[in-house]
């Protein structure tokens, strides 16, 4: 769902997974900022870069709006797990946030979820990644930037899904293309869902039960 205004959320059903794509511009930014909590506003004051401020306002504002749809009488209390992954205390929804140059994405589900977005136009030194062996990808990953980003976004989404980010050694996680699907193996197998949209590659990783429900991608 491409979201420009919080007013677009009136019919939203959070019983199923959903992903939002937010343009990083000033359009309707006040409608997002007014939903920031006091703690959010205090953290916003610490951000100096204007683009980072827009990202913070729109993504945090959106998450707070979604929280309020189910908790109209409560204030969102943002916390971080020990690896720095944000969550809202007491909310039975899991969310994940990712940024590219001009777009941010927010994914929300009742199950664990991770999302990553990358700009297909970014410069990537495939040879360097292949030489350093920092990543545990199959050889096909280095055939083109498109193939690499399919694996890389899946890996990043998976690391957010488990709540560790790059605190987990990426070498321990195998990412392979199997029958046109991206499969992640860290001792058990999980498939990444992928969206190619408007010059971006987006990957989502969720609990297998959540896949059976189907995600609403708009």
Per-segment meaning from a language model:
Residues 1-218:
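Core catalytic alpha/beta fold that binds nucleotide/phospho-ligands
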């Amino acid at each position: 769902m491409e979201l420009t205004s919080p007013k677009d959320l009136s019919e939203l059903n959070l019983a199923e997974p959903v992903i939002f794509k937010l343009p990083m511009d000033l359009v309707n930014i006040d409608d997002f900022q007014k939903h920031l909590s006091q703690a959010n506003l205090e953290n916003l004051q610490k951000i100096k870069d204007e683009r980072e401020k827009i990202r913070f306002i729109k993504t945090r504002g959106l998450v707070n709006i979604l929280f309020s749809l189910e908790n109209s009488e409560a204030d969102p209390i943002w916390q971080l797990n020990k690896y720095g992954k944000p969550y809202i205390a007491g909310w039975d929804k899991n969310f994940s946030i990712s940024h590219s140059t001009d777009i941010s994405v927010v994914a929300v589900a009742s199950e664990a979820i991770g999302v990553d977005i990358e700009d297909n136009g970014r410069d990537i030194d495939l040879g360097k990644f292949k030489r350093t062996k920092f990543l545990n990808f199959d050889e096909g990953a280095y055939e083109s930037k498109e193939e690499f980003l399919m694996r890389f976004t899946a890996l990043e989404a998976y690391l957010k899904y488990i709540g560790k980010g790059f605190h987990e050694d990426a070498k321990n996680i195998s990412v392979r293309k199997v029958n046109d699907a991206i499969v992640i193996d860290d001792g058990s197998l999980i498939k990444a869902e992928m969206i190619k949209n408007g010059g971006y590659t987006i990957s989502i990783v969720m609990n297998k039960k959540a896949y059976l429900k189907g995600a609403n991608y708009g």
